[in-house]
C-alpha cells in the first residue's frame, strides 16, 4: 500500500547506517528529514536531505525541488546545491522537457544550483519519478528533535497548502463535480507558488529549538514525528491550526482532512515562550502568516501512558485532547488509488 512506512518497519531501514563516522552530527532517525555533517575546518555544518516525488503529475519537477530544499531549510541551512535523479516511463521528449524546465525554473528561483544527477527510462513506471538530494551549510543546525517542555508550537501559512494545489490541478474535474467554484480552484492552484518554506525557516530559525516541515500525512504526521524525535508530547488545538478557505473547500468536497494530507508550504516550529513574539514578528516582517497552535509537554521516561498532562508516552500528540493512535496515512492516496 502506497505511503510512508510505519515507525516499526522504518526502524529496519534506519538501523542500516554503514561505517561509523565521527563527523556525522545527525544521522538517520525517526522524525529527522536531514543529515548533518560536521565540517569542523570550515566552522560549518553540511546539511543533506533526499526526497522522491511521483504522484503530483502536473507539477512533479517543481514539487520535487521544493520538498528537498524545504528539508534543508527546516534544518537551519540555506539550500545551495541539488542533485537530480529522474526516472521516466518512456522517452517522450515533451515529458522530459516539461520536468526539466520545472526543475530548472524552481531551482533558479530559490538560488539553488543543480550540480548533477541521473536520467533514464524505466518502463515499469506509469509516471515520472523525481528523486532530489539537496545540500546547504549552516553555522547552527536545527533538528526536529530539539523541542523542550514548555515550548510553544507555531505553524506558518496553514495546513494542506501542497494538497490544495494538487486537488485543484490533478483533481480539478472531481472538485468541480462536487461543487467547488472554478474561481476557487484557480486560486487554489496558485498555492503551488507557496510550497517553499525557505523564507519561513530563515525568519524563525534563530528563535526555534526545533523545526519540521509537514509533507506526506500533513500537519498531524509532522506533529507526531517532531514529538517522537524530541522525546516529548504535544497538545494542539485543531481550531488554532490555520486552514484557508480554498483548502477547506477542496478538502471538504473530496472528503479529505486538511490536517492529514500533503502539507509542504507550512513550517512547524517549537519556540521558547519568551521568543514567540520574536518569531511571529519575524514572520510578519517577511510577509508570512504564523499562528500558535499548541504546546510541548513533558513525556514519561518509563513509557507508561496516562491521560493527565505530562504523563504521555514520547511522541504522543493530542488534538483537542484526543491522542492520535498513529501517524495518519495521507488522505490523498485513496483518491489516486481510485483511479487505478
Report residues per predicted region.
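Small-aliphatic-rich amphipathic alpha-helix that forms the alpha element of a beta-alpha
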Residues: 57-82, 99-112, 199-203, 221-225
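Active-site-proximal betaalpha loop/short-helix elements
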Residues: 91, 188-263
Amino acid at each position: 500500500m502506497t505511503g510512508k512506512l510505519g515507525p516499526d518497519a522504518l526502524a529496519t531501514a534506519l538501523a542500516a547506517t554503514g561505517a561509523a563516522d565521527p563527523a556525522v552530527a545527525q544521522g538517520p532517525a525517526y522524525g529527522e528529514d536531514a543529515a548533518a555533517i560536521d565540517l569542523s575546518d570550515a566552522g560549518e555544518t553540511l546539511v543533506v536531505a533526499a526526497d522522491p516525488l511521483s504522484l503530483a503529475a502536473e507539477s512533479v519537477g517543481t514539487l520535487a525541488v521544493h520538498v528537498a530544499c524545504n528539508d534543508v531549510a527546516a534544518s537551519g541551512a540555506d539550500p545551495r546545491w541539488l542533485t537530480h535523479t529522474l526516472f521516466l516511463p518512456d522517452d517522450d521528449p515533451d515529458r522530459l522537457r516539461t520536468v526539466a524546465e520545472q526543475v530548472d525554473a524552481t531551482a533558479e528561483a530559490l538560488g539553488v544550483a543543480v550540480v548533477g544527477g541521473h536520467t533514464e527510462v524505466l518502463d515499469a513506471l506509469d509516471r515520472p519519478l523525481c528523486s532530489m538530494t539537496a545540500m546547504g551549510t549552516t553555522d547552527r543546525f536545527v533538528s526536529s528533535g530539539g523541542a523542550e517542555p514548555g515550548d510553544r508550537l507555531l505553524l506558518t501559512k496553514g495546513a494542506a497548502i501542497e494538497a490544495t494545489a494538487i486537488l485543484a490541478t490533478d483533481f480539478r474535474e472531481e472538485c468541480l463535480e462536487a461543487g467547488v467554484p472554478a474561481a476557487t480552484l484557480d486560486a487554489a492552484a496558485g498555492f503551488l507558488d507557496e510550497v517553499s518554506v525557505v523564507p519561513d525557516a530563515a525568519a524563525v530559525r534563530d528563535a526555534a529549538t526545533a523545526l519540521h516541515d509537514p509533507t506526506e500525512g500533513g500537519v498531524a504526521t509532522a506533529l507526531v514525528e517532531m514529538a517522537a524525535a524530541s522525546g516529548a508530547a504535544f497538545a494542539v488545538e485543531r481550531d488554532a491550526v490555520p486552514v484557508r478557505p480554498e483548502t477547506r473547500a477542496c478538502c471538504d468536497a473530496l472528503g479529505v482532512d486538511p490536517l492529514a494530507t500533503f502539507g509542504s508550504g507550512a513550517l512547524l516550529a517549537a519556540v521558547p515562550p519568551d521568543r514567540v513574539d520574536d518569531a511571529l514578528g519575524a514572520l510578519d516582517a517577511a510577509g508570512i502568516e504564523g499562528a500558535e497552535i499548541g504546546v510541548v509537554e513533558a513525556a514519561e521516561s518509563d513509557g507508561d501512558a496516562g491521560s493527565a498532562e505530562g504523563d504521555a508516552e514520547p511522541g504522543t500528540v493530542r488534538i483537542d485532547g484526543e491522542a492520535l493512535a498513529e501517524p495518519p496515512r495521507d488522505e490523498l492516496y485513496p483518491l489516486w488509488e481510485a483511479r487505478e
